[in-house]
Amino acid sequence: LRTNGLKYSKSIFTPVLAGQTDHDYVLWGTWPDGEEMYREYGSFLNDYKNKGSINPGICHTNVAFFNTAAQHLRIPLEEYDRIQMADFSSCKFTEDSSWEEILSLAAESESANQELGRDGFGIHYLRPYRGFNVDTPFDMVRMIHYYNKEKRAEAVASWPKVRDYRKENGTAEKWGQHIESCSPMKLYSMEWIYDTR
């Protein structure tokens, strides 16, 4: 990848508190943009020398999402855990939903979290792009990842403050204008394998 100047990172996610799943792990690739994605794909299809070699596992589904980093409340890199925690929830949009408004609400939420002294996590909105069926039962997957275990624990401890803030500011009502429903959260572990970006 580096030899060819390709910008790509790969992580592995494994179920922790995710109920019954049809998979043992999820491989997650990230590119800076669509241009870099197809450049890396093309290099794999044309230049990779080990195609057909024995793999340690078989992936039965390959899909692509539009990945929008909706919020990032970062901490110093040296405080990151090697294996982090990530919560996933699939959501359905309302008929009158507005993507711009959803992003605006995310910006409001980021500011509110800063006011409440919360940090150490990021929120991504993943919208289906390639490889999905027309009857895909969700419009977006929300991922919340925590940079270390202490920040995950702090998020639980600070939830009453967040709940009160949401009530006072009508956050749930605003969110409900655009999001019809979301599934219960599923917890995965997240570990970076490599990054050439």
Identify the residue ranges that each predicted region occupies.
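Short S/T/G/P-rich N-terminal loop/turn motif that feeds into the first structured element of a domain
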Residues: 1-50, 55-169, 173-197
